[in-house]
């Protein structure tokens, strides 16, 4: 009788990113993560009680497959920061950096880089690979869901500050994901609960809102997330389900070759595409590399029904998002002078 230990098969990252319910993995979740269609896990505030628990959870997720799954989180600063206690730095809303730009552009650039570094260094010390940041939407003073998450109303300022922030992310070994292509800032409706409609023509959107994506490209911004917003003068489908937006405009016209994530397919803004299978098929058919499904019951339904061959190009793009070097643990990070300085700067801008 053979005594050889069974080895896990090497599965490439699949096209579906799922969530987990709590602070540890259940048996059902471990089974779900072994599904070949799964390529990543998104974490939320409910998955965090303290750093020790978070590190244990991310280790368990990474160990679920021989080729580790991508672990992501929405951790932008301001009101969208999933981990807030047990040593995590309170990061400013990005609008504060835009206000600083109006007074002192160089200081704003420096602080943006330091914000990106602190954000990424702390997440990576706890085993998180990617934050869905920065927000590239322009601040028109209309969208409550975007609001102070946006850097500025000027596309040039948004581009410069987001570039500086991504440099900070890169210093800690983390990639960036710009959102929400081609722009969510012009509409008041919240795509979590409604289906926003932006009536502007394509030329206006490309000139203003989409300009940061064109200027930054995939070398600076290796991932992008489209908006669950309908632009009827361009396509009847929300951008994330639109081949015109993802394949023709983003990939071909703007020459973008990074990862395209769908936004959460369980949001109300995605309901126009149909049930969960129809939503996933529409997003992948439009050119997305990975779809987010942030409800376990719908994730299981999708994994049971979805039949798709993940393109080799998508697999390679997703692999490029994984960190390229090991991160220092939390205690080592706390003793790093660069980190200490960057953290003090964030505290100053948060406290005003």
Swiss-Prot record:
Enzyme class of the recorded protein, top EC level: hydrolase
Protein EC: 3.2.1.52
Gene3D superfamilies xref list: Glycoside hydrolase, family 3, N-terminal domain (3.20.20.300)
Site feature (Important for catalytic activity) residues: 190
Known catalytic reactions: Hydrolysis of terminal non-reducing N-acetyl-D-hexosamine residues in N-acetyl-beta-D-hexosaminides
InterPro entries found in the cross-reference section: Beta_hexosaminidase_bac, Glyco_hydro_3_AS, Glyco_hydro_3_N, Glyco_hydro_3_N_sf, Glycoside_hydrolase_SF, NagZ_Beta-hexosaminidase
Location of the protein in the cell: Cytoplasm
Highest taxon, organism lineage: Bacteria
Role noted for this protein: Plays a role in peptidoglycan recycling by cleaving the terminal beta-1,4-linked N-acetylglucosamine (GlcNAc) from peptide-linked peptidoglycan fragments, giving rise to free GlcNAc, anhydro-N-acetylmuramic acid and anhydro-N-acetylmuramic acid-linked peptides.
Entry's family note: Belongs to the glycosyl hydrolase 3 family. NagZ subfamily.
UniProt xrefs under HAMAP family: NagZ
Protein name as it appears in the record: Beta-hexosaminidase
Organism of this sequence: Bordetella pertussis (strain Tohama I / ATCC BAA-589 / NCTC 13251)
Lineage: Bacteria, Pseudomonadati, Pseudomonadota, Betaproteobacteria, Burkholderiales
């Amino acid at each position: 009788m053979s005594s050889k230990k069974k080895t896990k098969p090497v599965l490439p990252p699949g096209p579906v990113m799922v969530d987990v319910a709590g602070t540890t993995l259940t048996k059902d979740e471990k089974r779900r993560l072994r599904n070949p269609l799964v390529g990543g896990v998104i974490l939320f505030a409910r998955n965090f009680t303290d750093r020790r628990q978070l590190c244990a959870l991310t280790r368990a997720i990474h160990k679920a497959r021989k080729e580790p799954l991508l672990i992501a989180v929405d951790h932008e600063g301001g009101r969208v920061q999933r981990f807030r206690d047990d040593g995590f730095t309170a990061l400013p809303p990005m609008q504060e950096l835009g206000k600083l730009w109006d007074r002192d552009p160089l200081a704003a650039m420096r602080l943006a880089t330091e914000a990106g570094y602190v954000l990424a260094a702390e997440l990576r010390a706890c085993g998180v690979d990617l934050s869905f940041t920065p927000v590239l939407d322009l601040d028109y003073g209309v969208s409550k869901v975007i609001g102070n998450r946006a850097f500025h109303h000027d596309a040039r300022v948004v581009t410069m500050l987001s570039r500086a922030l991504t440099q900070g992310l890169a210093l800690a070994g983390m990639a960036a994901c710009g959102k929400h292509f081609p722009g969510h800032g012009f509409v008041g409706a919240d795509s979590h609960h409604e289906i926003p409609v932006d009536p502007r023509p394509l030329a206006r959107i490309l000139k203003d809102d989409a300009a940061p994506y064109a200027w930054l490209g995939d070398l600076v911004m290796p991932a992008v997330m489209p908006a669950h917003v309908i632009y009827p003068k361009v396509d009847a489908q929300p951008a994330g389900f639109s081949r015109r937006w993802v394949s023709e405009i983003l990939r071909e016209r703007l020459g973008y070759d990074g990862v395209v994530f769908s936004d959460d397919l369980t949001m109300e803004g995605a309901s126009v595409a149909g049930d969960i299978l129809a939503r996933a098929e529409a997003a992948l058919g439009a050119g997305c590399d990975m779809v987010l499904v942030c409800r376990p019951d719908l994730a299981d339904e999708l994994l049971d029904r979805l039949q798709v061959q993940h393109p080799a190009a998508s697999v390679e793009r997703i692999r490029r998002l994984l960190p390229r070097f090991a991160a220092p643990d939390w205690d080592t990070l706390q003793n790093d002078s660069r980190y200490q300085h960057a953290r003090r700067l964030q505290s100053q801008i948060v406290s005003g």
